[in-house]
Amino acid sequence: LSTISQALTPSPSMILETIQPEIVYAGYDSSKPNTADNLLSTLNRLAGKQMIQVVKWAKVLPGFKNLPLEDQITLIQYSWMCLSSFALSWRSYKHTYPQFLYFPPDLVFNEKKMHHSAMFELCQGMHHILLQFVRLHLTSEEYSIIKVLLLLSTIPKDGLKTQAVFEEMRTNNIKELRKMVTKCPNNFGQSWQSFYQLTKLLDSMHELVSDLLEFCFYTFRESQALKVEFPAMLVEIISDQLPKVESGNAQTLYFHRK
């Protein structure tokens, strides 16, 4: 009976795959010129919609509800940019050729749009992550677990309210990633190397996101002068996150130290 029960019980990776957020649309108006303010405002509106989906996703993550609401909010605030850019690379990997960035179905960035957006170098950074997906032949199972680990990779320097519960959830997901690469037939005899490469990918996301946040905070401060719009959801998140990050209160949990 226990064997049947185990066979019928979905694995953690299967659960994570089934709860992935729906793809949302940017509402991109192709009749407007591709100026930096129009493109950035559209991306901000998209990010606001995506954050609603991220909150819904986080709520049903195994173990996340064991954290107090304050800790849940803190983790989402610290990781939103990481989650958004990682999901962007995944969509680009699945739906386009490697030279494009697939923000939503109605707004795909080619090199021309990257230049027009005033964030060409940042787009190149996101494109580099996409190329890592291609090189690693990233699977949906690996993507799903790494995404959870990104949610759990930045915390306040003085820790969370329930640090022990957080550490247990993070440890469980690290173990699941180890288990997954060990079972993968493509990784036979090389599971340690696959785990190393996947965790290096995870660490590299934080380096990119540091630059993305710097640009985001700048456009947020200068939004009126730059004519860049921010939806209410992002205003709330950034207003709370910005002083914490710039005061050095955010601690990133790396797998590898340089």
Swiss-Prot record:
**For the region Hinge, what residue ranges are annotated?**
1-6
- Spell out the subcellular localization from the entry: Cytoplasm; Nucleus
**GO CC terms of this entry:** cytoplasm; nucleus
Q: Which UniProt keywords apply?
A: Cytoplasm, DNA-binding, Lipid-binding, Nucleus, Phosphoprotein, Receptor, Steroid-binding, Transcription, Transcription regulation
The protein's organism comes out as: Ovis aries (Sheep)
Under PROSITE patterns, the record lists: NR_LBD (PS51843)
Spell out the InterPro entries in the cross-references. Answer: NHR-like_dom_sf (IPR035500), Nucl_hrmn_rcpt_lig-bd (IPR000536), Nuclear_hormone_rcpt_NR3 (IPR050200), Nuclear_hrmn_rcpt (IPR001723)
Question: Where does the NR LBD domain lie?
Answer: 1-238
Instruction: Fill in the PTM field for this protein.
Output: Phosphorylated.
Gene3D superfamilies attached here?
Answer: Retinoid X Receptor
Domain of life the protein comes from: Eukaryota
What's this protein's family per the entry?
A: Belongs to the nuclear hormone receptor family. NR3 subfamily.
Question: Its Gene Ontology molecular function terms?
Answer: DNA binding; steroid binding
- Residues annotated as binding 21-hydroxyprogesterone are 44, 50, 91, 219
Q: What is this protein called?
A: Mineralocorticoid receptor
What this chain does, per the entry, is described as: Receptor for both mineralocorticoids (MC) such as aldosterone and glucocorticoids (GC) such as corticosterone or cortisol. Binds to mineralocorticoid response elements (MRE) and transactivates target genes. The effect of MC is to increase ion and water transport and thus raise extracellular fluid volume and blood pressure and lower potassium levels.
Q: Which residues bind aldosterone?
A: 44, 50, 91, 219
This protein's domain notes? Composed of three domains: a modulating N-terminal domain, a DNA-binding domain and a C-terminal ligand-binding domain.
Q: Enumerate the residues binding progesterone.
A: 44, 50, 91, 219
